[in-house]
Amino acid sequence: MEDFVRQCFNPMIVELAERAMKEYGEDLKIETNKFAAICTHLEVCFMYSDFHFINEQGESIIVELDDPNALLKHRFEIIEGRDRTMAWTVVNSICNTTGAEKPKFLPDLYDYKENRFIEIGVTRREVHIYYLEKANKIKSEKTHIHIFSFTGEEMATKADYTLDEESRARIKTRLFTIRQEMASRGLWDSFVSPKEAKKQLKKDLKSQGQCAGSPTKVSRRTSPALRILEPMWMDSNRTATLRASFLKCPKK
């Protein structure tokens, strides 16, 4: 799984995920499924905001990177992936500027068009189950929730999907591709099932020549929002390196 992640995700996303796991004492060599899940979630957050801007009339428009109007205001502020202190600084700044209610938990994005924070979810289970879990945790009608699955399903607060159909299709296609690539490598079952994950882990440890008695317990702790290696204040180049291109999974 670790090799798969390094091959199929943008190197910067991989580095951010590594730093997030290290900060919380999680070993990516052991918790490879969590490593893959963190990378997937971060990529979806960036794809969610890709090419979406707000013009002078306050209208949401889609602009390609090489467009001369790329200096328009970004529609979405990316909070996920920042250092925790920086993330709360950005959230507080947004609340002070827009009058938005401060969320109890760090959200993933802020939508300047709809003036609301957004919580993004990527699940390997039924979307409605994961949606309810998110809603019960957040307990706030002010934070908009949008859940994606690897099967192309999605669910959002009040069926308001925020993005246009084409933008959402890009995310769904990427998730489906990740699932297919995992399946072709025999990794999907272990990614979905904890029992299969333990079997795969033992197999990986043996193949690496490690002691058969090495610990195989997978931590149940949930990592908070990803921690980015440096702040990205809102400007036209803040996510250029990530938006330039997402690496495609090489053929098996």
From Swiss-Prot:
The active site is at E80, D108. Keywords: Decay of host mRNAs by virus, Eukaryotic host gene expression shutoff by virus, Host cytoplasm, Host gene expression shutoff by virus, Host mRNA suppression by virus, Host nucleus, Host-virus interaction. The keyword rRNA processing does not apply. GO terms for biological process: viral RNA genome replication; viral translational frameshifting. It holds the Pfam family Flu_PA. The record marks L28, L65, K202, K203, K206 as: Important for efficient shutoff activity. The record marks K195, K198, K199 as: Important for efficient shutoff activity and nuclear localization. It comes from the Viruses. One of its GO terms (molecular function) is RNA binding. The probable endonuclease active site in the N-terminus and the basic amino acid cluster in the C-terminus are important for the shutoff activity. The C-terminus acts as a nuclear localization signal. The C-terminus is recruited to host protein complexes involved in nuclear Pol II RNA processing. Plays a major role in the shutoff of the host protein expression by cleaving mRNAs probably via an endonuclease activity. This host shutoff allows the virus to escape from the host antiviral response. Hijacks host RNA splicing machinery to selectively target host RNAs containing introns for destruction. This may explain the preferential degradation of RNAs that have undergone co- or post-transcriptional processing. Belongs to the influenza viruses PA-X family. This is Protein PA-X. It comes from Influenza A virus (strain A/Singapore/1/1957 H2N2). The gene is PA.
